[in-house]
Amino acid sequence: MTGSHEMESIMLDSMEEEFPVSVETLGKLVDVPKGFDTYAELGGLSGLSTKLKSNIKTGLPLEKSSTEENRVLKYSKNILPDPPHQPLWSIVLDALSDHILILLIVAAVVSIVLGSIDYTSDHPETGWIDGVAILVAVILVVGITSLNDFKNQARFRELNDKSNDKEVKGIRGGEQCQISIFDVKVGDIISLDTGDIICADGVFIEGHALKCDESSITGESDPIKKGQPQDNMDPFLISGSMVIEGFGTMLVTAVGVNSFNGKTMMGLRVASEDTPLQMKLSVLASRIGYFGMGAAILMLLIAIPKYFIQRKVHDIEITREDAQPIVQLVISAITIVVVAVPEGLPLAVTMALAYGMMKMFKENNLVRNLASCETMGSATTICSDKTGTLTQNVMSVVTGTICGVFPTLDGIAQKIPKHVQSILTDGMAINSNAYEGVSSKGKLEFIGSKTECALLNFGKLFGCDYNEVRKRLEVVELYPFSSARKRMSVLVKHDQNLRLFTKGASEIILGQCGSYLDEAGNIRPISEAKAYFEEQINNFASDALRTIGLAYRDFQYGECDFKEPPENNLVFIGIVGIKDPLRPEVPEAVEICKRAGIVVRMVTGDNLVTAQNIARNCGILTEGGLCMEGPKFRELSQSEMDAILPKLQVLARSSPTDKQLLVGRLKDLGEVVAVTGDGTNDGPALKLANVGFSMGISGTEVAIAASDVVLLDDNFASIVRAVLWGRNIYDAICKFLQFQLTVNVVAVTVAFIGTLTSDVVEDKDNSSSSGSADKVTEEEPRQGSPLTAVQLLWVNLIMDTLAALALATEPPTPELLERPPNGKNAPLITRSMWKNIIGQAALQLAILFTILYQGHNIFQHFVPQAHGPIIKNGLHHYTLVFNCFVFLQLFNEINARVLGSRTNPFKNFFNNPIFIAVMIFTLGVQIIFVTFGGSATSTDSLYIVEWICCVVVGAISLPVGLLLRKIPIREPVVKNEIPVHSEAVYTSPSPNPSSSNLLGSGGAKPISKDYPTSGESTPPINDEGSPLVTRKTSVGASANDNINTPIPSSSSNLVNLNKPTQVGRGWQIVRQTHKKLVVINALKEFSQNKEPGLVDVVRGTNRGSLHLPVNQINN
């Protein structure tokens, strides 16, 4: 023992010598207030990297060594310990703590005591069996249920681990590489880009315009720019904060539980909450439980007095032995409550979610939010990104125009002047964050933005070495790309002066230019060729190519302060056309969505023409569909927006704010919205949507953190699979609910009525007079319920755990996407489900009561004569009742596999091996239960012919189920509730919005409703008080219309008014000029204007159409 202590001491001393900086000291760097003094004491960046055995240029070594092992031993791993999960024994204790089960256990113990002593039992040698059997049944039910819960928890933990495992960019052994977030160590060099969530504490090494949002940590609302202390800047990077601008590198100083975020997360761990459906079903289970409790209490209030009254009427003395029957009645009542409480409902949800999530993960959907599994099935619209989701995100430059040439890539280096090549390649290399490195697949390739990777590959055609360019050019200032700016610029030192390189959306870059490079590489005024470049942009866009504009400008030192990007009067280098092939499976996936009643909208930053062509190729843009650009969309008023949304299919040149506005307004209109996003600024839209899908490959960490589901392959088809699984999970719950409620009603009713109608005294007299010596005639009629506590507990196990396992694991079928989505306000139990529940319950009760009251006569014809008569209410009689009851449930479980009017419950039957296994297991246990249970299960062995009869009786539920499903029934149309408060974030409309925001070309179809003849809004009226005859102009444009075309003043839709006219409540006055529609005011009248060319019209504020009076037109 002493030797081991000495060895441990030596190892600690060795680590202290190798890594002299303690964990506590490193932690002080990012504590509040931040440790500037500690940083200085450690020797700043160089001193700290030396003490941590790291190199700020080459990072940690790739080779394993004792130093690296000691590093992990001292500073820990970047992994938080798993939250303490509930062990199996704890789950068992939780299950046993149920008040109803405790009552049942207490009653069973009392039954054992009373049944095993002479004082209270006629047969003490066997009187204890019932109580012990109940205890064994309770243990089995609790054990199987708890084991199931334990396995579900393990599945969720496994998925959670997978969702947390991400890769970050770093430098090791002098090479840029991808590092698992769990493998990040103290001393690592990590690269940071806009949108990253910092994975560990660290200090700034170098970078440009790196700003972090630390508001959730320090309370500082403004972004904090990072740099070196000597520049009076903050060098400390805190784990959990977000990079909102710029890029850079950092030296890791703390990981895992020692990092700032690790300490915070360890203190904030809370248990996961139930999903909305779980909570809804828990409430339903409680209500059903109250019904069972009421039935049990009522049964006791009737049965116990009845027992004593019967004894008194027949002059039978009441003795101490009567305590045992009373206890059995109490046990029966408690068992009714146990059976009535459908604990399986929340269990079925958990099981369906666990099973569905595991299967979805295999199909490239990583679920981060459990509730989203339920919501996905109700999605009515999908707002999808284009790049990487609808397309393959495998980009390559295929054409373009530089210096007026470059139709193809062949011999391009010979077609473009050398000095222009130098400008072009310098700009593509330095104005980029992409780099060549080893990918997660082990391949050497460009890593980063796919657009930038395509440009770097294009630069290779000119012999460009991007590393040489980046070493040669010194960056002075960086102006990062943003979805709002649609461009990125970098300012570098160049020949004693400065040069700005800019790239971005081609039409935006072109608009910033004052000159261009001609075929010889000379600078010429842009006015000479602007029309040509615009034509080329449209040509490339018509071929579904992304167009990127490239430009530059030279500056003198001191020409401006460069705090704001000087992106004006640029020299236009040219345009490159980038091809991003459509994913081959997308058109079919879009068509599936249409059949499923889901509207697909494309929201993209590309220009309108490119977006239209891609959308048309996907099948998203259809005849009569609308396309619009983001800046125009955000200028629409709420009523105008509501008018175009039903037909809006493409939103081009959109910003994240436009996407958020679109999602919010769709939700306001009652839609269940799924949205995709990959950028940092997509976070609000992803959070706002009912289901947010982030990109697992191209998505930023901020987008992933804000999403509900991560698309591991960035593929639109995976969204369709997620919707399929969402519907399947919902259907699985409905199937189980349909099955369980039927069993509940039947079991409780049979136990309740059977107990109340049994006449023990008469049965005893009958049995004693029979005088037969065989085994059945020697038995006595049984007191109380025809279904004993042990039998009901077995039924409870069948209908709770086993049925949940069988029905919750049904695989999805294509038919799920052949119907409209379930409304988010749709009832959990539909009319067709009630039809099946009530119909099956009525059938089963009719059969069981027939067997209960006449079964001893009916089955007498099927047993050998040697058996003797079947005693009414005897052991054999009640065994037949119990066996028929179980077989009715087995066959009804097959019925429950289908919902609605579908006829064939055996379709895809063999596609679910779990269902088949459960059926075989249940059948096998039932045979053992009846044949060998004896006194423990209160059963008597049956003859083969009786088994056949029970199977035939149970199978009756199949044709009856078919007939029930054939009965037509109309489901009520559930209207989605329109929220009182809008979730959309509206920007203030421009005072002069373009007319194309509101009106399409003359051929467009109207898409909005006429004004109402009654209700909150009234139509305009003339001076005599009569309503004006109105007609409606169209709103929006079809896919083939040019929505940017202004409406000429000579349009036949425009009218003039010859005198003031009153306007009804709820209408607006709108002035139509030759170019614009302007809301004048909210007054009650409008008139002909003095100004020429101006016309007033009226518009319903809550309608999307314009109503123009036609009975007062100047001819």
Curated annotation (Swiss-Prot):
Stretch list, region Disordered: 762-784, 984-1056
UniProt GO molecular function: ATP binding; ATP hydrolysis activity; calcium ion binding; calcium ion transmembrane transporter activity; P-type calcium transporter activity
Taxonomy, superkingdom: Eukaryota
Active site per UniProt: D385 (4-aspartylphosphate intermediate)
Main location: membrane
Function as written in the Swiss-Prot or TrEMBL entry: Calcium ATPase involved in Ca(2+) homeostasis as a component of the contractile vacuole complex.
Name of the protein in its database record: Calcium-transporting ATPase PAT1
Organism expressing this protein natively: Dictyostelium discoideum
